[in-house]
Regions:
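Nucleotide-activated chemistry modules centered on ATP-dependent adenylation/adenylyltransferase
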Residues: 1-267
Length: 267
């Protein structure tokens, strides 16, 4: 959705597009490099990564650990808790460069559109908010066809799903999620099962913060969380489905994989 937005605004509308990725811990250095390369291929004038991982941890994530927070006793609020911090980072950058508008790829299906729109309206009230996918009611296939027809080649095999990756888990939307009774196939998950059997996991907390994993001490709690995620994801731990009420008044169904949250909260 965002890729389509960048290309369409640059090629069809003549916008000078500044592409920004607000990273809350979900991207590796390699993935961020790919984001940058793709942004320029799509027609962006400039690309930046805005790292807000530690801000997110200090102002939100650690309190969810303190409170063992699970929405409806199922969902660790994986990506939804990050959206405000991503939105604020984008808004600050938009003001820094003197942007006339802010565009995002929300589809209109759930809560993210509200989180982003409200953040931008509060922090950048004079800027136009552009949401092509939502306002034009575009299907994912229409966007893929447009990108292909304009020479942008990529692996679109998983584009039946929409992934939002963060340090506190990955949400998966689309495909079987749109049916009330189907589960996700193994191939839908970004992190594949590579281990079977059992393994001992020892977590050490100091004043509610994760400080050590299997005796290995971490000065940075974020690094400790990533270590737990690496261990648990290999076994497919933390995969589930959540159904809840959205801000816009409809039921929302989302799949997720969140090994670290489920292990840490369980501990």
């Amino acid at each position: 959705d965002t890729s389509y937005t960048v290309m369409y605004l640059a090629k069809e509308k003549g916008y000078e597009v500044y592409a920004a990725c607000a990273n809350t811990g979900g991207f590796s250095a390699e993935q961020l490099k790919t984001n940058e390369e793709n942004a320029y291929k799509l027609g962006a004038t400039k690309y930046v990564t805005l790292d807000v991982t530690h801000e997110y941890y200090e102002k939100s994530l650690k309190f969810m650990v303190y409170g063992n927070v699970l929405r409806n006793n199922v969902y660790p609020i994986s990506v939804s808790s990050e959206r405000i911090f991503q939105g604020m980072a984008i808004a600050r950058y938009a003001k820094e460069i003197g942007a006339d508008a802010i565009a995002h790829g929300s589809t209109g299906a759930g809560n993210d559109q509200v989180r982003f729109d409200m953040t931008f309206l509060v922090m950048c009230p004079d800027m136009e908010i552009i949401t092509l996918t939502r306002d034009s009611n575009l299907s994912r296939q229409e966007e893929v066809d447009y990108l292909n027809s304009h020479g942008f080649s990529a692996d679109f095999t998983k584009l039946k799903y929409s992934y939002n990756v963060g340090i506190w888990g990955t949400s998966i939307c689309g495909g079987e999620i749109l049916d009330s009774k189907q589960g996700l196939p193994e191939t839908a998950y970004l992190k594949q099962v590579t281990k079977t059997g059992t393994e001992q996991l020892a977590l050490t907390f100091e004043k509610g913060e994760l400080k050590a994993v299997n005796g290995e001490h971490f000065d940075d709690p974020i690094a400790a969380i990533c270590k737990v995620e690496e261990i648990g994801a290999a076994y497919g731990i933390g995969r589930d489905m959540h159904v809840g009420d959205t801000i816009i008044g409809i039921k929302g169904r989302v799949g997720f994989e969140a090994a670290a949250p489920m292990l840490i909260i369980g501990a």
